[in-house]
Amino acid sequence: MVRTSSFVIFLLSSVSIAAAADIDGPLVGPQDAYEVPVEQASGGIVGYVETSYGAAVDSPGDIDADAWDLRGAVNFDAGAGFNLQVDLGYTRASFEDIDTNSYDGALHGYYRNDLFAAGVFVQGARLDPGIGLDLNDYMGGVEAAYFLDTWTLHGAIGYGQASVEDFDDIDADHYMGSLGARIYATDNLRFDVDGSLHRMSENDLDYDLRSVKLTANYRLDAFPVTLFAGYKYTNEELSGLSDSVSGDTSTLFGGLRFSYGSTTLKEEERLGPVWSSNRLAF
C-alpha cells in the first residue's frame, strides 16, 4: 500500500519543474505604507492572452528541462463592486525525452473597490505525463488584495485534492499558500515578486514545492502588448518513511501578453483580472 499510495507524490515530484509566468509576489518595504489609495472606475470587460517560454538553467542532475505556456484571463464587472474572473491555461513541458501536457482553469468571484478586493476561487488542473495515467488536481480557497497608488499586495490560501485516474485509493491532500506584490515604477512598468508553497500529503509521504519568482513587465505605449521576463527559484522536497530527497531548480523565462479593454498595465490590473493562477506548476 505504501508503494502504491506514494505514486501520486512521486508523479508530482518528477514533473514539477516546468516554467510558469504567473504574476505574484511577497511583501514590500514599510516606506510605502504612507501612500494613499488610488481611485478607479468601473471596468466592464477586461482581459489578456499571453504566451511564455522557460528553460531550467540549474536543476537536480542537470536535467534538460523547458516549457512553453499559453494562458488567458478575462474579468467581468457585474456592477456594485462585484466581479467574475475566468482563467484558462495550457503548458507543454519537456524533461529530457519526456513530454508532458497540463491544462488548468479557475473561476474567481469577488468584491472590489478602490482600496481592496476579496473573494473566493475554485480551480482545476489535469496533467498528462505521457505514460498512460492522468493526474487531476482540484482546489478551492480565499484570496485578497490591497491597493495603493504604486503597489498592490495580494495573497491566497487554498485546499484541494489530487488523484490519479483509475486508482481510486490514491488521493493526496493539497495545501497552498501564496503572497505577492506588484510594484509600479510607472503605469506601464511593473516589477513583481512572488512566493508560494504547495504541500501534497498522502499517508506518511509529503511533497513540498516552494518557489520565489521575480518578474519585470513593460507595456508598450503605442500597442496593447506587454513584454515580461524573469527568474524563478524552486525547491522541492519529498519526505516520509524516515528519509527525504530534495532538489533546487533555477528557471529563466520570458513572454508576451496581448491585452484588451485597458490602456495601461496598471489599469489592466485595477479594472481587469487582478488574480493570478494558484495552480501547481507542473
Q: Model segments located where?
A:
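Residues on the lipid-exposed face of transmembrane beta-strands in outer-membrane beta-barrel proteins
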Residues: L70-F76, L107-Y111, V142-Y146, L179-I183, ...
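Transmembrane beta-barrel strands of outer-membrane/channel proteins
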Residues: V49-A55, V86-Y90, L107, V120-G124, ...
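Repeated loop/turn-to-beta-strand initiation elements of outer-membrane beta-barrel proteins
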Residues: G79-V86, N113-V120, T150-G155, D187-V193, ...
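Sequence/structural signature of outer-membrane beta-barrel proteins
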Residues: G54-P60, G89-D97, F116, Q123-L133, ...
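Short glycine/proline- and aromatic-enriched beta-strand/turn motifs that initiate or cap beta-hairpins
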Residues: A21-S94, F282
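Residues that define the transmembrane beta-barrel architecture of outer-membrane proteins
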Residues: G43-I45, D64-L70, D99-G105, D114, ...
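Flexible, glycine-rich linker and terminal segments associated
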Residues: D22-P30, E202, T226, S239, ...
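Detector for outer-membrane/organellar transmembrane beta-barrel domains
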Residues: L135-E202, L209-K213
